[in-house]
């Protein structure tokens, strides 16, 4: 039996959801040019990414049931998966404006498309609101309807808290490494990434299959939040040490003054001389200064520090997975699949 969802089958669900949203907009007699605009917003920003979060919802359903999904289960879990992708699109459209980013998924960021600009702010709002339009249409009579609503609201709030902390800790135009700390870093990655990327998809599948007991949700939380933290540390490591040809992007964390895992490790380990170098070279739009920071990372042997962190963290996560209580329908396979996808990844 297939233990993962086919990407093509998952992608085939999206056009019907886009149609649902456009039909809903038309109920308000929205002028045709605005309907066309919204259609473009949906098609440019929602599909086309890696779809990891979205695919995780039906994949989790398969792992929980230990058998193929019925057509209805597949459709519903895929819709919930696409709602995580709508949420992601809302965050990314907004985030790219806040960061003045240039490209996203190899294309110009949405706000940089001709004629879009600041209209992208309202477009982001509409992507978020679309989540609740779809939830109502497809899940209004599901026993977990209110739980779905609360989970999306709570996850959105958590992600925004993480984003706030990120934006004020590391503004691109003002470098102050005294602002950085491992505590702030862990807060940012936990709230900005771990909840919506890891906890949300599994919690949605548990709710849909009516397996979301307090114990199951707690166990899910206690494994997936550390897993999400590890994923982000890995991302930060790959930004400096990964191969751009493999990752598909050139790392910019050093020049962007990011409060990353590597700079926090460097700050904990550097001497006075090295700290001076970091203060003058970090967060500057200058590739020679960036190269100096990377050379200092090498001097401090941060690659070894990362490898030790990885083995220790993955060991702890594996122990937690092994200790899962499956008596209420939770399955170890759910978490083994997540770990398998990210352990020692190169992109």
Curated annotation (Swiss-Prot):
CDD domains: Trans_IPPS_HT. The keyword ATP-binding does not apply. Keywords: Lipid biosynthesis, Lipid metabolism, Magnesium, Metal-binding, Steroid biosynthesis, Steroid metabolism, Sterol biosynthesis, Sterol metabolism, Transferase. SUPFAM superfamilies: Terpenoid synthases (SSF48576). Mg(2+) 1 binds at residues 95, 99. GO terms for biological process: alcohol biosynthetic process; farnesyl diphosphate biosynthetic process; geranyl diphosphate biosynthetic process; mycotoxin biosynthetic process; sterol biosynthetic process. Binds 2 Mg(2+) ions per subunit. GO terms for cellular component: cytoplasm. Transmembrane segments: none annotated. Farnesyl pyrophosphate synthase; part of the second module of ergosterol biosynthesis pathway that includes the middle steps of the pathway. Erg20 catalyzes the sequential condensation of isopentenyl pyrophosphate with dimethylallyl pyrophosphate, and then with the resultant geranylpyrophosphate to the ultimate product farnesyl pyrophosphate. The second module is carried out in the vacuole and involves the formation of farnesyl diphosphate, which is also an important intermediate in the biosynthesis of ubiquinone, dolichol, heme and prenylated proteins. Mg(2+) 2 binds at residues 95, 99. InterPro entries: FPS1-like, Isoprenoid_synthase_dom_sf, Polyprenyl_synt, Polyprenyl_synt_CS. GO terms for molecular function: (2E,6E)-farnesyl diphosphate synthase activity; dimethylallyltranstransferase activity; metal ion binding. Dimethylallyl diphosphate binds at residues 104, 192-193, 232, 249, 258. Isopentenyl diphosphate binds at residues 50, 53, 88, 105. Its EC number is 2.5.1.10, 2.5.1.1. Belongs to the FPP/GGPP synthase family. It comes from the Eukaryota. Its cofactor is Mg(2+). It catalyses: isopentenyl diphosphate + dimethylallyl diphosphate = (2E)-geranyl diphosphate + diphosphate; isopentenyl diphosphate + (2E)-geranyl diphosphate = (2E,6E)-farnesyl diphosphate + diphosphate. The keyword Magnesium applies. Pathway: Isoprenoid biosynthesis; farnesyl diphosphate biosynthesis; farnesyl diphosphate from geranyl diphosphate and isopentenyl diphosphate: step 1/1; Isoprenoid biosynthesis; geranyl diphosphate biosynthesis; geranyl diphosphate from dimethylallyl diphosphate and isopentenyl diphosphate: step 1/1. This is Farnesyl pyrophosphate synthase erg20.
């Amino acid at each position: 039996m297939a233990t993962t969802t086919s990407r093509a089958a998952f992608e085939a669900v999206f056009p019907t959801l886009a149609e649902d949203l456009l039909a809903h907009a038309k109920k308000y007699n929205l002028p045709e040019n605005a309907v066309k605009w919204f259609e473009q917003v949906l098609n440019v920003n929602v599909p086309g990414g890696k779809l990891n979060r979205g695919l995780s919802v039906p994949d989790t359903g398969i792992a929980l049931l230990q058998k193929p999904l019925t057509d209805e289960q597949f459709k519903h879990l895929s819709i919930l998966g696409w709602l995580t992708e709508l949420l992601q699109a809302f965050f990314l459209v907004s985030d790219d404006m806040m960061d003045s980013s240039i490209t996203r998924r190899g294309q110009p960021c949405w706000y940089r498309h001709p004629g879009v600009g600041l209209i992208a702010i309202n477009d982001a709002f509409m992507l978020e609101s679309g989540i609740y339009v779809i939830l109502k249409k497809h899940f209004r009579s599901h026993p977990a309807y209110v739980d779905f609503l609360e989970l999306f609201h709570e996850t959105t709030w958590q992600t925004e808290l993480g984003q706030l902390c990120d934006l004020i800790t590391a503004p691109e135009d003002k470098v102050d490494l005294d602002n950085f700390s491992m505590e702030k870093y862990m807060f940012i990655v936990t709230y900005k990434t771990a909840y919506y990327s890891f906890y949300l998809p599994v919690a949605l599948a548990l709710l849909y299959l009516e397996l979301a007991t307090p114990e199951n949700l707690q166990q899910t939380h206690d494994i997936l939040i550390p897993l999400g933290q590890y994923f982000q540390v890995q991302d930060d490591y790959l930004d400096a040490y990964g191969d751009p040809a493999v990752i598909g992007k050139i790392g910019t964390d050093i020049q962007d003054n990011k409060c990353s895992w590597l700079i926090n490790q460097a700050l904990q380990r550097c001497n006075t001389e090295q700290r001076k170098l970091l203060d003058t070279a970090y967060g500057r739009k200058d590739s020679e200064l960036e190269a100096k920071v990377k050379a200092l990372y090498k001097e401090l042997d941060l690659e070894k520090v990362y490898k030790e962190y990885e083995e220790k963290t993955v060991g702890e996560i594996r122990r937690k997975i092994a200790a899962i209580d499956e008596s209420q329908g939770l399955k170890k396979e759910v978490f083994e699949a997540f770990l398998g996808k990210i352990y020692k990844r190169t992109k």
